[in-house]
A protein has these predicted regions:
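Charge-rich, intrinsically disordered N-terminal extensions
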Residues: 1-351, 371-372
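Extended accessory and catalytic-adjacent subdomains in large enzymes
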Residues: 234, 239-240, 280, 284-287, ...
């Protein structure tokens, strides 16, 4: 370990003192006894050994090398890189760190960015736990252990490292620390509070059996919980679907048609300003439709006797259906032109970021996302699920040989995959992004189950679903000098689709 004289003597002194206290040789110490000697912080170690407390890392190295000590998560904060230097040597440690730097650069990280030191420490921690100084031999189980039981300051970095190694082909798939550390499942809140146990058991059984899209199952699930609270208060004798009659179903339709925001629900802080106002017609119709789906499935699966027809009873009345129709929230021509100009002229200085640190996403990717949102006419989910190589060019005989840009759109909630012509600027900006896009690992398409190369991926992760609404649109509004809200409300991802569709519908040709 090439220790200097002072820490060398201090280490011998400290271990000798502890052997005398414990009345046994250091190689007979248990993991718990080593943890007690090493202490959970540098300050506690200094306080324990006084003037000879300047050698904590050397004591850890001796425990690791000579006695198989591996309870490193109990040691609190320490410099994993320096401990690796002591036990693996500088040559092996620096070679591993250099290999990690190459892999990070390959997936889009900026070399020398001080914010990435945590990833290096996570690698060193994994090598120490596996006793293996090669990044290629780190396994995902070790990183998951660090993310769940390791020091708090390394948990997020361990998940990030897993995605970097997955992108480099070391193992199949990384993991997301934020998902695994949620206190409850996504968007679950306290949704089952006050729902009768018997009704809840039927709902959970239906939820586990249904083969609809996950988003459709989730939407239906929350409506069923709302219905359960309504039953507990108004029809406690019908908390089992088996006890429902035609009259119960009609009572639910009546209640749904008069439903107000926050009624029969446990919304927490959501919709606080609108609470108590009448729900939108489409939302009230959804309450009826989802309960209809529930009873239709139960009867089709033979789980309950047929006492009424969901198709005839659980349907929206005409008075409600007539209130539902197309209502595109288009952006005015003036604001739309400013947004288009902003999207075509984004510069590095327009991207928010800390002083001295670049924006998380590359400029080329932000430009491609902006232009695709402004000209593509796609849903947010379709934009974020676009695949590499989605742009093709076709010569046109009618336009003096000018090329037509064709774009492959992935499977959506209403259509199979298809190809559509788009403005050439979309193809230009997407191809510019593909030229600088770092190689990324294959990921599973949540709709089709295929392993694909998503176009908008960076540092081993897809662009988050909230990025367009919460980051990109405000960025374009700021660049264009317009407010984020207009006469029709907040400018969101879907309003671009509504605006483009309305423009095409009203066009002469």
């Amino acid at each position: 370990m090439h220790a200097a004289r002072a820490p060398y003597n201090s280490s011998l002194h400290d271990i000798t003192v502890e052997m005398q206290r414990l009345r046994k040789t250091y190689w007979a110490w248990t993991q718990s006894e080593w943890s007690e000697v090493i202490c959970s912080t540098e300050g506690d170690f200094h306080q324990r050994f006084g003037a000879s407390g300047n050698c904590r890392q050397y004591v850890m190295a001796l425990a690791w090398l000579l006695c198989g000590f591996d309870r490193l998560e109990s040691c609190g904060v320490f410099y994993q890189y320096r401990l690796c230097l002591k036990v693996f040597g500088r040559q092996h440690t620096d070679a591993a760190v250099f290999r990690l730097s190459e892999m990070m650069t390959a997936v889009g990280y900026v070399p020398g960015d001080g914010r990435n030191n945590g990833i290096r420490n996570a690698l060193c921690m994994a090598m120490l736990l596996q006793r293996e100084p090669q990044p290629e031999r780190v396994n995902v189980d070790t990183l998951q252990y660090i993310a769940s039981a390791g020091p708090a300051y390394l948990r997020k970095s361990a998940a990030t490292l897993s995605r970097i190694l997955a992108s480099s082909g070391i193992f199949n798939e990384g993991f997301d620390y934020r998902v695994s550390q949620r206190r409850r499942p996504p968007r679950e809140y306290n949704a089952v509070t006050d729902v009768p146990a018997e009704w809840l058991s039927w709902c959970e059984r239906w939820r586990a059996t249904s083969v609809q899209r996950p988003s459709s199952i989730e939407a239906c699930w929350y409506v069923l919980l709302k219905c359960g609270r309504w039953l507990a208060d108004c029809h406690p004798e019908c908390v089992s679907p088996v006890n429902w009659t035609r009259e119960t179903a009609m009572a639910w339709v009546t209640a749904a048609c008069k439903m107000k925001v926050g009624e029969w629900s446990n919304p927490g802080g959501m919709y606080r300003e609108r609470r108590g106002s009448m729900m939108k017609p489409s939302a009230r119709a959804g309450l009826i439709r989802h309960v209809h789906t529930f009873f239709h499935d139960l009867q089709e699966w033979g789980w309950m006797p047929v006492k009424f027809s969901p198709e005839r009873i659980l349907r929206s009345p005409r008075s409600l259906s007539t209130q539902i129709g197309p209502d595109p929230r288009i952006v005015s021509d003036e604001l739309w032109c400013k947004l288009i100009h902003a999207g075509q002229n984004l510069q590095e200085t327009d991207l928010p970021g800390c002083v001295g640190y670049p924006y998380f996403y590359p400029l080329e990717m932000v430009r491609a996302l902006s232009v695709l949102w402004l000209f593509g006419g796609l849903r947010r989910d379709e934009i974020l699920r676009m695949r590499c190589g989605c742009i093709r060019w076709q010569a046109s005989e009618e336009n003096d040989g000018q090329r037509i840009c064709l774009m492959d759109v992935p499977v959506s909630k209403t259509y199979a995959a298809f190809t559509k012509p788009v403005d050439s600027i979309v193809g230009d900006y997407i191809e510019r992004w593909e030229l600088v896009r770092s190689p990324q690992a294959l990921q599973e398409d949540p709709k089709t189950g295929e392993s694909v190369h998503f176009l908008f991926m960076h540092r081993g992760k897809r662009v988050h679903g909230s990025y367009i609404n919460n980051s990109l649109v405000p960025l374009l509004c700021k660049k264009a000098g317009i407010p984020e809200h207009d006469a029709r409300g907040r400018i969101t991802s879907h309003r671009a689709r509504a605006t483009i569709a309305s423009q095409l519908y009203n066009a002469r040709e």
